[in-house]
From Swiss-Prot:
Source organism of the structure: Hydrogenovibrio crunogenus (strain DSM 25203 / XCL-2) (Thiomicrospira crunogena)
Protein name: Putative pterin-4-alpha-carbinolamine dehydratase
Keyword Lyase attributed: yes
The keyword Mitochondrion belongs to this UniProt entry's keyword annotation: no
Any one Gene Ontology molecular-function term assigned to this protein's record: 4-alpha-hydroxytetrahydrobiopterin dehydratase activity
The protein's enzyme class: lyase
Catalytic activity annotation: (4aS,6R)-4a-hydroxy-L-erythro-5,6,7,8-tetrahydrobiopterin = (6R)-L-erythro-6,7-dihydrobiopterin + H2O
A GO biological process held by the record: tetrahydrobiopterin biosynthetic process
Amino acid sequence: MTTEIALKDQSCETIEKGSKAMIIPRIESYLSQMPGWDVPLDYQTLTKTFSFKNYHQTVAFVNAITWVAHKEDHHPEICFGYNECKVILTTHSIKGISQNDFIMAAKIDALLD
């Protein structure tokens, strides 16, 4: 019997420059399990916009993301305003999406569980 570890329970790994980005069918397979996350047509980033009641909740969420990013050494682009936060994930060393991006997405989603 094979037991698969949930993405949120995995850790990001170092991805060497020159490694290949994740292939589109695999991206789409992961994406189907990640409600609210989106991949633009160029398949280079993974994005999601989160909404909150106020600025305090938004900033608290951003701060929580930065802690996870620090622990995982995988840092998203974060854009936020009064009650909204957009998270953009990509693996810079390969100029595309890797499993690390989906691990971070799952960990970010888990912050709101």
